[in-house]
Every structure is written in structure tokens, then in C-alpha cells.
Amino acid sequence: MSDLAREITPVNIEEELKSSYLDYAMSVIVGRALPDVRDGLKPVHRRVLYAMNVLGNDWNKAYKKSARVVGDVIGKYHPHGDTAVYDTIVRMAQPFSLRYMLVDGQGNFGSVDGDSAAAMRYTEIRMSKIAHELMADLEKETVDFVDNYDGTEKIPDVMPTKIPNLLVNGSFGIAVGMATNIPPHNLTEVINGRLAYVEDEEISIEGLMEHIPGPDFPTAAIINGRRGIEEAYRTGRGKVYICARAEVEADAKTGRETIIVHEIPYQVNKARLIEKIAELVKEKRVEGISALRDESDKDGMRIVIEVKRDAVGRVVLNNLYSQTQLQVSFGINMVALHHGQPKIMNLKEIIAAFVRHRREVVTRRTILALRKARDRADILEALSIALANIDPIIELIRRAPTPAEAKAGLIARSWDLGNVSAMLEAGDDAARPEWLEPEFGVRDGQYYLTEQQAQAILDLRLQKLTGLEHEKLLDEYKELLEQIAELLHILGSADRLMEVIREELELVREQFGDARRTDITANSVDINIEDLITQEDVVVTLSHEGYVKYQPVNDYEAQRRGGKGKSAPRIKEEDFIDRLLVANTHDTILCFSSRGRLYWMKVYQVPEASRGARGRPIVNLLPLEANERYTAILPVREYEEGVNVFMATASGTVKKTPADEFSRPRSAGIIAVNLNEGDELIGVDLTSGQDEVMLFSAAGKVVRFKEDDVRAMGRTATGVRGIKLAGEDKVVSLIVPRGEGRILTATENGYRKRTAVAEYPTKSRATQGVISIKVTERNGSVVGAVQVDDCDQIMMITDAGTLVRIRVSEVSIVGRNTQGVILIRTAEDENVVALQRVAEPVDDEELDAIDGSAAEGDEDIAPEADTDDDIAEDEE
């Protein structure tokens, strides 16, 4: 115990944590998670391929059990679990994981549905043909070898690859404090980019992108936009969006549309994708899908999504793109080990690092070839000398009592050059090995043999003494001199060295190059999508139930006076058109919600539908939250100076904000007005700065004031008081009066009246205002007020779901301070909850039909005769 105590050294825990964690982090970064920029391999990939190479598990030989390879890897090179090694092998054998597979697998290696591979005892593997190019010239001293984990084996520090594997197959890894995510690319394009760099090392990133336009994924699909690619290639970091390749097919007979998905984004699990679509349909977050099935087979992928009759296939597909992994983002983070250190590298730096690596590999290979050629030439010189001096050499050997004395005799004297003097003198300098001392070789017209040369002469077989063999020796020597001259040219000329690299890259491209799979398309990030949209005037309709659509304005043809006109959309009987806007397809629709938020929508983003179609729910087009509803929609073409957005809340707060404050759209919406708890936005309108504003309260009060009484405020301001409310009173309507129309006011018990705008006096802001309609027990509270003309129609809705539509001309015109007359008789527990001016035009026959179906009898909707009490005005 005392001996153990003497071996324990107290340390500061903070210092130990720093030191140990740093060691661990560097071990993970360098030895596990990040690829080398030169060969694009992590250590485990490199060790697997090297083990297969040592085993002779070549592409043109028999498969070997995966377990055999795994055993060799973990036993010799990779002292970790077998699962990590086998998972690496599986990934290198999956056609949907690697753009160019490095392992040729036989058996079950998983699927794009996320199925696991079979156990390693069942599957068999061998190297793919292209994997051999990663280890080409490995035996030619092209790379350094290092000890394995226990010093009993040697493994390559890096592969002498001819394949630019880092870009071709990409890499993914999470280290400590950093990660890498490099997408795969097309081999032909990557080699073209490297060839362009070899020709001009000053080439720009833009120049390289002419050859390498972007990633090329094994699962194909489509990349939306080039900006993310450009950013990643320029800085080493960026984001690209990959969407599935899908098409919308229409049945020629029924007209029903079907979405067919042929390709999905990289690394997306197809089974989970289908489950997610089904879940969204079940939760009604995506509408318009009637059936979903997977018809994929060995010939390819095919996901079939059947669209309902009243749905638009392209709209459904766009919703799926936005809510599922039919479209995903791929974050590019090109981190690799460069000179043993992690570094974020751009496209040019990665290409330059590979070319430098190939330059070193070719140089080292050439040096070895030169050394071997000179050694062989040295032996051929000795054999040529022996043939030129055959008789004296044979005599010397015959007289020598032992081989050692014969060798010593050969070395001790000089030899005539004979008939090979010209050949030997021509190749003396080029073919002379670097290790050869000056006293050996050709000197003073004589030849002096080395010990190695003397041994080669003693080993010479008698058949080599024939004349034919003599000629072969001379021919081989001449070929070696030519080879040595070429090798020296490669080592002495940078241009020739790069030419060799270029020739080898071209050979790889010719042998393994293929066509691009992934298309790259421009999107709204790169171009202005409005340039692709035809400008035309359209009619946008939004129903009370929240269905929106547009139709070309030409669908509403001009009619002679007295004509029947075209019927409006026949939607559901309990629904009606709430808002009708005439706008241009390039206009922006500002959508304000009850929670004071603003959302943007371009008119061309609204689905186009026929007259008889309902359109699409606006909640599918805007990211509205639960219990959030739209309050107002306003069309805006240009954010002109002097135009304001005027807002009013239920608590009587008003706010005026310049329209250009809302000129920068955000996909998630923005806060248009800050609301106090329990408050909500009830009305929004555009003003010119010279308008007047009217606020109507549930207690029958109205205040009319000039717009300039409210100063312009910033987007996030709360606003100021517009009307002074008493007790539980609240604002129900905001009106910016325009023209000489009348104000129609309605109460919850079905009473209504029309009053000229001129009868409402202009007062100061923040006052109680004047009476707009007398609120009594008979009338009930005010539910709303609208400005109308004689030709308009209105719709009243009750909490029991009853809708009554009536012509405005049938509502009596009375004074401001009156109770009004009955418009709709409600049941005992039934109240009117909303009043809305109907936006769409209809003919008289249709109006009568709607009125007849909505009311139990004519007497229920016929206005009562005005009584003296009804129209008698009280003093204010």
C-alpha cells in the first residue's frame, strides 16, 4: 500500500481536466472524426481499405466475408469496436450513401428506407474498381507509413489517391468543438476543375465553378438555388436546399391530378418521409390528399400521392415541400485536416491541396523509378562488360579457387570497354547510381566493377552468353537510358510533372467519369420570381370561412344595365365572400391577424381557381398560430410616401404607422402592433394622412376624428387612445369614411339602421363620442358597422349559424340617435355576432334563392314599418 502511495502524485483537477480534455479532443479530431484533405478518408476508412488491399480482396477476385475484413481491421489497425468498422464498410457499400462506392457488397446492406444491413457474418465484400485508384502506387514509396497502435504493423499515413475523393464522395463527421459536412460531387466535373487549376493556378472560384457547378448527390434530386453553393465554395461554409424530383400528372378523363415523386433529397429516409406525409394529412395540416402509396421497386423510386378533385396538385406539392423532407437544407461545412490541423477550406484550397499531394506522390514515385532504373542499368553495364571481356573473365573464374576470390578478382582489375564503349560512355552520367563511388564505373577508358556488379557476373547463366542474349542486353540498356532521361525530365521540369498529373487525371475521368445526377435550378433567392409572373389584373376573394383564391378579372365580363351577370363562387351555403379585392398579380397583400401580427403574401401566391371552386384555406398559406384569425387584408402595389396603415384594437387603442415600415417581408410575419393582454386587433385600413377615422363601440357610441390627431409611430409601438370606453365596452368596427355613403349599424338582437356619414360630427380623439345607435334591452349591443351604398348587400351571421343576406336598399335611412328597425328575428337564445358587407356581385335570382334558404319565412327577414319611436331623435 505504501508503494502505491508513493506512485500517486497530487494534481490540480482544473489543470488535469484541461490537459486531458485537450488530448481527447485532438485525438478525436485527428484520429477519428475529420478526413484528410489529400485522400478524403478518415482513419477508419483508410484502415478498412488498406486491410482489404493486404488481403488481396480486389474487385476482380472472389468476395470475402465481411467478418473476415472486420477482424483484420480491429486486430491490426483499428483497436475499437467491430460495430464502428462494420458500419463504415456498410456505408461504403451503399449506392445511396456514396456517390462512388468504394466497397462492392454482396448481401443485404440496408436500404433508403432505413433498413439495417444484415450481420457481418452473412454479407460479403470486396473492393470496388475505383477503390484501387485510391491505393495506386502505394508500394512505390509514394507515401509515408506509420506504426499501428502496438507497433507491430505499418499502415499508410495517407493514400496516394488518383481520385479527388474528398469532393467526389464528400464526408461527414462530428468532432469536439467542430464538425465537417462536405457534399459529394460528380467525378467528371471535379477532375475538370482540377485540370483547370493545373492549367492556371491563379484561377478564381468563379472560374472553377464553371467546371464544378455544385454538389452531385447519389440520390439525385434537385438543388434549388446557386447562392448557397457559391458561398460554400468561396468561404467553406454555406447552405443549399435540396428538393425531391416530382411531377404532377393529370388524368385525361377525370382531370384528377397525381403527384409522382421519383427522387428524394440526400440522406432522407423514404419510409419516415411517407409516414410524415400521412401524419400531416391525418392532422389536416396538409389538405387535398386522398391517397398515398409507395410503388418503389428494383427499377427505381416511385411515391404516388393522389390529389383530391377540388385541390390543385402544384399547391399540394408546394405545401409538402415546406412541411416535409421533400425539401431539406444541407449545411456545407468544409472542414478537413490540412498538414495535420483542422481547417475550413474553400473549393480552391481543397483542389490545390489535392494537386500538391499528387505532385508529391508523382515525384516520390519518379524518384523510386529512377533509382531502380539506375540500379538495373548498373547491372546491365556489368553484364555488357562481361560479354565484351568474356574470355578473360571465364579464365579468371576458372582459376579462382572460391567464388569469393573470383569476385575479388573481378573487382581488383579494370576491364576494357570493348564494343560497348560508346554505349557505356553515353549513359555513364545519366545511369550512374547516386550511391556509386567515383572510383567505380567508366574511368580513364576502363571500367571498374563494384561488388554488386561482380556478383551479377558470377550469377550470369551460360545461356546469356549467346549472341541473341547479348543484343537483348544492349536493347534493354538503351530503353533504360530513355526511361531515365524521361524520369529526369519529370523531376527537372515542373511543367512536365504537371503534365503527368494531368494525363493521369484524364485517364481516371475516361475510365470512371459519368453524367451528373442532381440538377441545379435557379430559385427566388437567385432571381426575382416576379420576372416570371405575367402581370395581369385579378379578382382576389376571401370567404368568411377563410378560403382564398383569385380569378383573372376578364372572367367578370362587363354587362349591359339590367343584365343577369355571372354568379359568384358557389361555396358552402354557410360561407360567403368576406373580402373582394381587385389587384395585380405583382401586388402584395398585407394580412393582419387578431393578435396584431402582419403576414405578407404576393397575389401570385394565392391559388388560382375556377368560379365554382372554393379556393384554399388561408391558414395553409400563412403561418397563423392556433386561435389566430385574420382581421384585414390590404392590397399594396408600392409603399408610397404619405400612405399610412391605421389600426384599431378592441380596447379603443389606435395606431398609425407609415406603410413603408411594412415593406420588408419576413416569412414568419412581424408584430404590427403591440397588444395588451386580452386585447385584439379589430380593424385595419390605409389612410392618406388627410382622412378621418370613425370608431364604433358595442355600447352604441361612435367617435369621429381627424387622422392627423394621431401621430405616426414605429412598428412595435402600442398606440394611443382613440375612444374613451366605459365599463366593459369595446370597439367593434373601424371605418375610414370615403365618399357620400351611409353607415349601416346592426345590433345583436337583429336591429339595423342606415345613417348618412354627414350626421356623425367630427370630435376630438380619446373622447366618448356620440350615440351611433340607441342600445336598449330590445336592441342589444352593437355587433358592427359598415359603410355602404344603395347597390350593396350585407350579410348578418348569428351564433346559431344562421346567415341572412339582404339588399342595403331595403334598410331604412334614419337619424343617428335612433334604435333602428328589426332586420332579422332571432330565437330566444340566438344573437347576431357579425355584420359584413358582401363583396361579390350576384344576380337577383340568386339573391332571392339565398334569402329564401336562409330564412324560415319571408316574415323573418322583412323589415318592419318604421314607428315614431324608432325614428324619433333624442337630444344628445
Curated annotation (Swiss-Prot):
| Keywords assigned by UniProt, alphabetized | ATP-binding, Cytoplasm, DNA-binding, Isomerase, Nucleotide-binding, Topoisomerase
Q: Write down the EC number.
A: 5.6.2.2
Catalytic function, reaction form: ATP-dependent breakage, passage and rejoining of double-stranded DNA
Q: Which residues form a coiled coil?
A: none
Instruction: Please list the residue ranges annotated as the Topo IIA-type catalytic domain.
Output: 34-532
Q: Name one GO biological process term.
A: DNA-templated DNA replication
Catalytic residues, chain numbering: 122
Where is the chain membrane-spanning?
A: none
Cellular compartments per GO CC: chromosome; cytoplasm; DNA topoisomerase type II (double strand cut, ATP-hydrolyzing) complex
Stored InterPro entries: GyrA, GyrA/parC_rep, Gyrase/topoIV_suA_C, Topo_IIA-like_dom_sf, Topo_IIA_A/C_ab, Topo_IIA_A_a_sf, Topo_IIA_dom_A, Type_II_DNA_Topoisomerases
Domain of life of the native organism:
Bacteria
* Region (Disordered) residue spans: 844-876
Q: Which SMART domains match?
A: TOP4c
> Where is this protein found?
Cytoplasm
Known PANTHER family for this protein?
Answer: DNA GYRASE SUBUNIT A, CHLOROPLASTIC_MITOCHONDRIAL, DNA GYRASE/TOPOISOMERASE SUBUNIT A
On assembly, the entry states:
Heterotetramer, composed of two GyrA and two GyrB chains. In the heterotetramer, GyrA contains the active site tyrosine that forms a transient covalent intermediate with DNA, while GyrB binds cofactors and catalyzes ATP hydrolysis.
Job of this protein:
A type II topoisomerase that negatively supercoils closed circular double-stranded (ds) DNA in an ATP-dependent manner to modulate DNA topology and maintain chromosomes in an underwound state. Negative supercoiling favors strand separation, and DNA replication, transcription, recombination and repair, all of which involve strand separation. Also able to catalyze the interconversion of other topological isomers of dsDNA rings, including catenanes and knotted rings. Type II topoisomerases break and join 2 DNA strands simultaneously in an ATP-dependent manner.
UniProt similarity note: Belongs to the type II topoisomerase GyrA/ParC subunit family.
Name recorded for this polypeptide: DNA gyrase subunit A
Q: Which organism is it from?
A: Klebsiella oxytoca
